[in-house]
Amino acid sequence: MSRAIRNIAIIAHVDHGKTTLVDKLLQQSGTFAAHQHIAERVMDSNDLEKERGITILAKNCAVQYEGTHINIVDTPGHADFGGEVERVLSMVDSVLLLVDAVEGPMPQTRFVTKKALALGLKPIVVINKIDRPGARPDFVINATFDLFDKLGATDEQLDFPVVYASALNGYAMLDPKEKSENMRPLFDAILKHVPARAGDPDGPLQLQISSLDYSSFVGKIGIGRITRGRIKPGQDVLVLDGDKPPKKARVNQVLGFVGLERVQMDVAEAGDIVLINGIEEVGVGVTIADINQPEALPMLTVDEPTLTMNFQVNTSPFAGQEGKFVTSRQIRERLDRELRSNVAMRVEDTDDTDVFLVSGRGELHLTILLETMRREGYELAVGKPRVVIKEINGEKCEPIEMLTVDVEEVHQGAVMQALGERRGELQDMQSDGRGRVRLDYRIPARGLIGFQSDFMTMTRGTGLKSSVFDEYAPIRSEATSRRNGVLISAEQGEAVAYALWKLQDRGRMFVSPGDRLYMGMVIGIHSRDNDLVVNPIKGKQLTNVRSSGTDEAVTLVPPIQLTLESAIEFIDDDELVEITPKCIRIRKRFLLEHERKRASKAAA
């Protein structure tokens, strides 16, 4: 007897409450014992996810409700991890679209909804954070309907059920005026509106792998949904991978999800979401098929990367002093390991054996990888991010992003001017009547490189911005480059307070007294547009002659604290970010001044 199954994904914009909602569904379905302590955002298991409050990897879990097994997939909201979202949607029969009751649909909501509607999925719309002051559910429902209509939804998809919820407080209702204590209305809506499992359990096996995991114990793990047939441990199967010849393989283990645990299954059948291991050839999009009647499913497509960066061996004078893994072989092995599960990423070799070209879906996608490597003890240098240029019909084209910014009205002018300089085109402008404005732009992706820090300064930390890839379009005129030059250290040694104090009039510093510096290292932002070589390790000249002047009190302005994102956004083409487990430094590509002059002449 087949068990009743529902497969759903939760999709939403960043910070609209996906992971918190999953927490409450797990708790209220009785998946955890009553006495068990549950961490907040239990699905965000990665350290970086917990710190930043974002979901990076799509996760699977399952709950039991009234005899039905509900598989839930929690997806990332950032477009940089959209490669995850697209594949996950191929495993499910419906989606819960979470929309903030105040903000309404946002760019990533648009990105993921477009993918879901194109696959023919019928969403259940959940208006979350209904308890927030300023909640406007009717406006949000109308905006969601308009969004569906713009994205070409069918009449059936436009007739979507709506559930009102507060994931944080753990309740849901079908009418915002009702009172509710729990999530039952949402569970009931899932059972009512999500189609039951489809597929013939007695037909020949078809299982498409839509995401990968890796275990040092069993090797590659494929995660996917069984479209047809049954699978059990020890079964012989064929691996069908596009045009490649079919390969025979044997399944080692079949695992299913119960709560957050992975549980071994004796047999799984059509409609189940399972993990299988023991097959070395497993990859995203491949079909695991019956050995006697193999039939391949169409390959899954993942959007191509839009941003590329050079990862290279650290060649600074401090190379190898702070990291555990420093050689090109170790960096390449780590990147290869990342490729096993990070499907939207590409790694290519270059003419220089110490430099690798790494491409991803955005700045966040690549900086998360760099931060992970840094914490694992890797030491490396990276260059300025560049957009991936494609040639379409003989014309060079660049990626264009849909950008939404939400700012206070007093900052609107400065933000619009900055986006205009970066070749942005204003598409829409809406005021919420409470002193904030939402601006929608189409802007070249390279115009957004380095915009985050400027934007936060302009809006005094109150602005919200998010962008999502829209299309490739012919290259427009050049975007503006960085306005300020940099201050470059002329010597190697430790920074001296007196020298930094004397240099304060020249610009803002990145370094503090006592920091180790080397020749060619960038120590601050120059107040003018040219680079300036300075000596930050020069002490005060002391003599044995009694001076009539008293000692001057040295008061230093606190330095700018470099984070990985801010450093990568800041650098120019002739600079590198040196990343070690202990430090993030900015340096010139050529450390010696005469080499820099020679390189700039050659470039001219």
Residue ranges and their predicted role:
Residues K122, R132-K192:
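Canonical P-loop GTPase G-domain recognition
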Residues I38-E40, L151-V163, R197-Q208, D243-F257, ...:
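Interdomain boundary/hinge elements
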Residues M1-V99, E103, A143, L212-S215:
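P-loop NTPase switch module centered on the Walker A-proximal segment
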Residues M1, C583-R585, L591-A604:
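Acidic, low-complexity intrinsically disordered tails
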Residues S316-R340, V557:
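A short, contiguous, amphipathic alpha-helix enriched in charged residues
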Residues R3-T20, A79, P105-K114, G120-I124, ...:
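Conserved structured catalytic cores and adjacent interaction surfaces
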Residues Q206-M309, A319-Q321, N484, G493-T543, ...:
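Conserved nucleotide-binding/hydrolysis modules and their immediate coupling elements
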Residues T68, M91-V95, L119-P123, Q157-F160:
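Short glycine-/polar-rich loops that comprise or flank the Walker A/P-loop
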